[in-house]
From Swiss-Prot:
Function: Probable component of the endoplasmic reticulum-associated degradation (ERAD) pathway.
Gene: LCL2
Keywords carried by this UniProt record: Signal
Organism, as annotated: Candida glabrata (strain ATCC 2001 / BCRC 20586 / JCM 3761 / NBRC 0622 / NRRL Y-65 / CBS 138) (Yeast)
Annotated GO biological process: ERAD pathway
The protein's name in its UniProt record: Long chronological lifespan protein 2
Signal peptide extent: 1-14
Family: Belongs to the LCL2 family.
């Protein structure tokens, strides 16, 4: 019985220690990618895309997110939110449009217009 308990504790310790090592490697991997990016312009922190300006940074999941610009003086220049879920094809076309989607302010929808109203 004691041998089983020792083996169980050893296995649990190895599992948790392995998880910590894996997390540390992932953090180092992100840091390495930032340091090794070779970006001479602006490096987006969320996506590690090299762009001309912070205004050009994409959302991490552009197919399902809207990039809402925030007013000057905010902690961040923009916030990425989930596109509103709707079965209305006309609304989906608006939200999928890279120009119209972020400008949309449709009553009753949690879009960029809603973000602006609730700051």
């Amino acid at each position: 019985m004691n041998l089983l308990m020792v083996l169980f504790v050893a296995q649990a310790h190895a599992f948790f220690f392995g998880q910590q090592q894996q997390q540390q490697q992932q953090q180092a991997s992100y840091e390495d990618r930032v340091l090794d990016s070779g970006c001479a312009k602006y490096l987006c922190s969320d996506t590690l895309e090299c762009v001309d300006s912070w205004k050009d940074c994409p959302c991490p999941f552009p197919k399902s997110q809207l990039k809402c610009m925030l007013p000057k003086g905010s902690n961040r220049p923009y916030v990425c939110i989930s596109k509103p879920a709707t079965h209305d094809e006309k609304l989906n076309l608006i939200y999928d449009d890279p120009v119209q989607g972020p400008k949309a302010a449709i009553k009753g929808m949690r879009d960029c217009g809603w973000v602006q109203q609730n700051l």
